[in-house]
Amino acid sequence: MTVSIAALMIGRSALLPDGKRSAIAKHPLAGPVRIGRLGLDGDLQVDKRHHGGPEMAVHLYPFAHHACWREQLGDHPLLADPGAFGGNIAVDALDETQVRIGERFRLGEALLEVSQPRMPCATIERRFERKGMVAAILESGRCGWYFRVVAEGVAQAGDSLVRVTDSGSEITVRAVFMALANPSGAADPALLERLATLPCLAEEWRDKAIAKRRRAGG
């Protein structure tokens, strides 16, 4: 699997319409950027309790999802921006159904590994000034995902995102999200057991699987 990168993006602290600060708005870079253990150089996180760190170093939110959002939000001006949902990588031809936890991708000189789905938060609704967006993501599974950085390196727009190793797991980002974040997600005991012990899945999501398994009496 090889997909072309339309843009690499970083965010700075800025005021949201409600007056609170966030770095969710990501803007395309004009040249190469170093991708380190904590993400792209210059990319900031204001809410470090819920964002950032090695397991959430690089975020990809599929730009193709913006078309679905237009059906819900209309022609919202933010939907023209590839970084509107906080993503660092803009691609069209890739989504949560095609990417599996633990898969590794080469991006320029950097090596990335899929670590977890992205859990939506209210910052999205505050940025767009629209209620119901978090619930829509939870129901639809259009969540995006995070990479951890296995090997640091430089990349730029126009490079390709190339899958270089199979995770050995058939579990897609969407499957994890729908099982553990979707309110209607069924408590499949076998899947919960698998997720609870899947080493390449970020610890926070393994803990979600353990908790759901306990609630289900497993």
Task: Give the predicted meaning of each segment.
Residues G42, F147, Q156:
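Short, flexible micro-motifs
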Residues V91, Q98, G144-A151:
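Short alpha-helix capping/helix-loop boundary micro-motifs
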Residues L161-T165:
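Short hydrophobic beta/alpha edge segments that flank linear recognition/processing sites
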Residues G31, C143-W145, A157-D159:
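A short pocket-lining beta-strand/turn micro-motif at the edge of beta-sheets
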Residues M1-R126, G132, G168-G218:
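Electropositive, beta-rich accessory/interaction domains or terminal extensions
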Residues G102, E152, A157-D159:
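Loop/turn positions that initiate beta-strands
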Residues F128-A135, E139-V149:
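Active-site glycine-rich loop that binds ribose-phosphate moieties when present
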